[in-house]
Amino acid sequence: MIHIEDADPDHADAKVLIAALSQRLAAITGSSGQASFEADDVRGPGAAFLLARDEQGRAIGCGALRPLQPGVAEIKRMYAAVSGQGIGSAVLAALEARAKSLGYEEIRLETRRVNTTAVGFYGRAGYRECPPYGRYIGRPEAICFAKPVVFASV
């Protein structure tokens, strides 16, 4: 069973997961993705940082939600320590539910095209490719996705 809880991105467990994600992303894409994440962006109104824990209380996944523009949230720092266990799906569902409860109309995210595992994961979760936004405009290595919150799982 996976338990999802709110956490601060500076919590020790969160830092370990974020560091593991950064290391994995650097190995896959050549970039850790750290430049596009600020802990303060996922604190406060309209934002969240979630940790996934297993039955023994071990931190096994994380994800963040931040305001991007009015009505639109962005998912950041999605990570599952183990693939194929439902961790990523549980974190994503919790982030989508939170976005809905916060009144967002759309969720967006970015990953790298070479990260085919993430591209497939988001596609299976109902996210569709959208035009690049913000810092991703003009960056052909980036692929952006969007999903209306009305279709988000809750």
Specify the residue positions occupied by each region the protein language model found.
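A periodicity- and composition-biased signal for non-globular, repetitive helical segments
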Residues: 82-83, 118
